[in-house]
Amino acid sequence: MKLTCVLVVLLLVLPFGDLITTSNTEDNKRGATPWQNSLKARGVCSTPEGSCVHNGCICQNAPCCHPSGCNWANVCPGFLWDKN
């Protein structure tokens, strides 16, 4: 009887195991928007329209406004106070 109860509980919990074991610090973030992800790096990037954004976006879809462009880590050089 106890074994049956344990098996039933495991069968109910197993489909949700990834929700329990997956943390938000891994690459497969849940509910994180590209805007939130872009705030990780500090630098100056260009939006698709070509205007500069001084909030530390990551160079993924547009080139940086900084003359040297993106570095090896695909992050814009410079800081928030840079005016290019």
UniProtKB/Swiss-Prot annotation:
Pfam families: Conotoxin. This is Mu-conotoxin-like Cal 12.2a. The modification 6'-bromotryptophan is found at W72, W81. It comes from Californiconus californicus (California cone). The modification 4-hydroxyproline is found at P48, P77. It comes from the Eukaryota. GO terms for cellular component: extracellular region. The cysteine framework is XII (C-C-C-C-CC-C-C). Belongs to the conotoxin O1 superfamily. Expressed by the venom duct. Disulfide bonds join C45-C57, C52-C65, C59-C70, C64-C76.
